[in-house]
């Protein structure tokens, strides 16, 4: 009887794990992450919200996400609080989460910074592993490569040698790159060594810049109608070569596509329509969604139960598009500011004030910022880092005018 106990226990454990996986598969659909051999949930976790809550709330939010079948998280945020909160929330369940962690994103002087300095990148990466209580991450994501010059400098660099060293040491299992530039992303896809591309994809960003879309009869039968030709090539290449795209800015960045007033297209999409649009691309493995609290997570999880009618975005797509450039998506890629101004937060509060009117609550939030728009020197350093061609100095002038400093 004693000899039967251990095998029986093992069988029961396997059955329990199988039942749990089956339950998740029933509720959540999974897709291959390119050629990595990993299966990832169709919707996944953006990490920004974990900076705004405490460890207890982080645990509650992560538990709900995991129990619902979400198994992928993008960790671009180098803020020690964010990393520590996620590490705490994953205690005992690390093996249930696939981590896409960024290499070359550090937290310096209270701001997120992009770096290609090997020592800085190494310190930032080791800090991430320590705070996550893990010895590896599944996807090592080279942080923000948006220009041809940045890509050319990356290839053959000591920084890239370090990335390959991490893979050889088993600290990362797969190599990815994040980009907002379709031409650069296509270069990355054709490099032969990139397995995952984190790319900004949504109905607005896919449109031809500044051009009218010929919505002729039958055009909606081809979901690529009206998409920038370089993006078409990128999506097709990734699909045929089994390179995964993990989608950022699914809802337009800060949910801009969900409100006709803020949408660059002038029409409102639902979250389900945005997600369905992205997942219509065979190359897309998962849509990363920013989640600030349990209510937002619950709303995102409605995707699992959404009807075909709720997912249908074709009626909205028939609207004439506007230019998607020039609108801030609060992504923080413009940082660091030489004056310490939290540019993304200033722009977020400015947009709210212009849409809703300046309220005492908005003024109080602005006043509490460590630095204000009036300190902007118009040095222009942020402009070269903004993927969306936002006129940041002009935005700062507007914020100073509205908020008074």
PLM region spans:
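Beta/alpha (TIM)-barrel catalytic core signal, keyed to glycine-rich beta->alpha loops juxtaposed to Asp/Glu
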Residues: 145-348, 355-356, 361-368, 394
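Active-site groove signature of glycoside hydrolases
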Residues: 127-151
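Structural preference for beta-strand elements that scaffold enzyme active sites
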Residues: 32, 40-44, 71-72, 96-100, ...
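Acidic-and-aromatic substrate-binding clefts and catalytic sites of carbohydrate-active enzymes
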Residues: 50-56, 74-84, 108, 115-116, ...
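Short, acidic/polar
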Residues: 52-65, 116-133, 179-187, 269-277
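N-terminal binding-site loop/beta-alpha segment at the start of enzyme catalytic domains
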Residues: 19-101, 162
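Bacterial N-terminal signal peptides
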Residues: 7-16
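Acidic (Asp/Glu)-rich catalytic clusters
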Residues: 34-37, 67, 87-98, 129-135, ...
């Amino acid at each position: 009887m004693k000899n039967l106990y251990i095998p029986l226990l093992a069988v029961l454990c396997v059955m329990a794990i199988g039942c749990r996986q089956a339950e998740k598969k029933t509720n959540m659909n999974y897709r291959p992450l390119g050629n990595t051999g990993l299966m990832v949930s169709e919707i996944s976790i953006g990490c920004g919200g974990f900076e705004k809550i405490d460890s207890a709330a982080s645990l509650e939010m992560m538990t709900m996400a995991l129990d619902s079948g979400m198994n992928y998280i993008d960790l671009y945020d180098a803020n020690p609080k964010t990393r520590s909160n996620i590490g705490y929330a994953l205690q005992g369940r690390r093996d249930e989460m696939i981590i896409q962690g960024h290499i070359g994103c550090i937290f310096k002087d209270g701001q997120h910074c992009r770096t290609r300095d090997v020592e800085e990148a190494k310190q930032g990466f080791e800090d991430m592993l320590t705070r996550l209580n893990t010895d590896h991450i599944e996807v090592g994501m080279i942080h923000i490569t948006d220009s041809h010059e940045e890509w050319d400098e990356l290839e053959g660099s000591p920084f890239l040698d370090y990335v390959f060293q991490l893979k050889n040491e088993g600290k990362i299992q797969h190599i990815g790159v994040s980009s907002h530039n379709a031409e650069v992303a296509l270069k990355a896809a054709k490099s032969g060594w990139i397995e995952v591309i984190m790319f900004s994809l949504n109905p607005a960003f896919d449109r031809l810049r500044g051009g009218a879309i010929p919505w002729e009869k039958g055009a909606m039968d081809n979901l690529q109608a009206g998409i920038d030709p370089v993006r078409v090539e990128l999506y097709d290449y990734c699909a045929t070569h089994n390179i995964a795209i993990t989608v950022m800015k699914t809802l337009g960045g800060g949910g801009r596509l969900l409100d006709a007033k803020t949408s660059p297209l002038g029409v409102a999409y639902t979250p389900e329509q945005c997600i369905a649009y992205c997942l219509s691309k065979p190359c897309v493995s998962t849509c990363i969604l920013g989640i600030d609290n349990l209510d937002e997570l619950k709303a995102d999880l409605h995707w699992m139960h959404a009807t075909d009618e709720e997912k249908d975005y074709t009626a909205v797509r028939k609207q004439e598009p506007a230019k998607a450039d020039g609108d801030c998506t609060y992504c923080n890629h413009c940082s660091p500011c030489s004056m310490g101004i939290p540019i993304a937060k200033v722009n977020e509060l400015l947009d709210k004030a212009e849409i809703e009117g300046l309220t005492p609550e908005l003024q109080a939030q602005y006043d509490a910022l460590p630095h204000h728009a009036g300190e902007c020197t118009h040095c222009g350093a942020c402009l070269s880092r903004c993927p969306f061609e936002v006129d940041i100095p002009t935005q700062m002038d507007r914020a100073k005018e509205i908020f008074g400093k």
